């Protein structure tokens, strides 16, 4: 997907969202059945923000509808809408059941993401996310496995490490990327993780490769040194890569970073990385 297309899509979503904010609840409810997916999502997001018993009730009804599009939008709304405490268990259980059993892979993926959002609001559901992921991590659907990696990133539980290592080897780049992100954000570390990251230094997916570089650098694994050095010499260098150079703690990177001071405008990040290396 090109950056131009993504920008246009984001612009449309932003415009539709602002339009939906001006509508009353009944008008938003009707838009949930619109043929335009962007209108459905925009109205759902406004309903999430507003909350209210009617919106929650309708979303729950949608979750058991014969139409998979309705089930999908219902699961999406329930992920982040404000609900009363006594309703939390019921809503999570509905989403959990959909994540495991819905016939539509699209709905399962949305339900998984929504269980993660509910867990963000109430970490008591972390064990259920772990249990759920033991099944969904092996789903045939790429979207479901990607959603699972995202859900695992929300919790911190070492029981998920074997699942994440398996997802690091997934044939799909988005799945690998989210699995690597989940490992890095939770600061998991063992020899299997590091070895996987070393293999991923040659990944064709740039985002996956960047996560691997960051992961190895923060773990002070010098096997990343040559690849990191090559990244720093490119015409376009991500801030995360510069920060990773500082974290690796190898002073041989100092000349490369010094050269970058005269090449890029954002000297603060580069200077910070240089200072870290000098102190290491």
Curated annotation (Swiss-Prot):
Would you kindly state one Gene Ontology biological process term found in this protein's UniProt entry?
response to radiation
Pfam families per the UniProt record, alphabetical = HEAT_2
Domain of life from the UniProt record: Bacteria
**InterPro entries for the chain:** ARM-like, ARM-type_fold
Molecular function terms, GO-annotated: oxidoreductase activity
In Swiss-Prot or TrEMBL terms, this protein is called Protein YibA
What is this organism's lineage? Bacteria, Pseudomonadati, Pseudomonadota, Gammaproteobacteria, Enterobacterales
């Amino acid at each position: 997907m090109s950056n131009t297309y993504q920008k246009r899509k984001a612009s449309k979503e932003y415009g539709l969202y602002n339009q939906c904010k001006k509508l009353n609840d009944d008008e938003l409810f009707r838009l949930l059945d619109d043929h335009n997916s962007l209108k459905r999502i925009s109205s759902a997001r406004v309903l999430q923000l507003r909350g209210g018993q009617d919106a929650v009730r309708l979303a729950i009804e949608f979750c058991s509808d014969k139409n998979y599009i309705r089930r999908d939008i219902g699961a999406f709304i329930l992920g982040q809408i404000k609900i009363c405490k006594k309703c939390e268990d019921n809503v999570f259980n509905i989403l959990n059941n959909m994540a495991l059993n819905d016939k539509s892979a699209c709905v399962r993926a949305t339900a998984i993401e929504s269980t993660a959002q509910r867990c963000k609001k109430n970490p008591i559901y972390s064990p259920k996310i772990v249990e759920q992921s033991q099944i969904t991590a092996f789903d045939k659907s790429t979207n479901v496995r990607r959603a699972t990696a995202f859900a695992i990133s929300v919790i911190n539980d070492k029981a998920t490490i074997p699942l994440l290592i398996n997802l690091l080897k997934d044939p799909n780049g988005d799945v690998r990327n989210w699995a690597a992100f989940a490992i890095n954000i939770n600061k998991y570390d063992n020899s299997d993780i590091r070895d996987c990251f070393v293999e991923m230094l040659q990944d064709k997916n740039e985002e996956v490769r960047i996560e691997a570089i960051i992961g190895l650098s923060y773990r002070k694994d010098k096997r990343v040194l040559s690849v990191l050095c090559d990244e720093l010499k490119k015409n376009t260098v991500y801030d995360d890569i510069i920060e990773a150079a500082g974290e690796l703690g190898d002073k041989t990177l100092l000349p490369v970073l010094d050269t970058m001071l005269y090449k890029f405008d954002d000297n603060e990040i580069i200077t910070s990385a240089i200072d870290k290396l000098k102190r290491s």
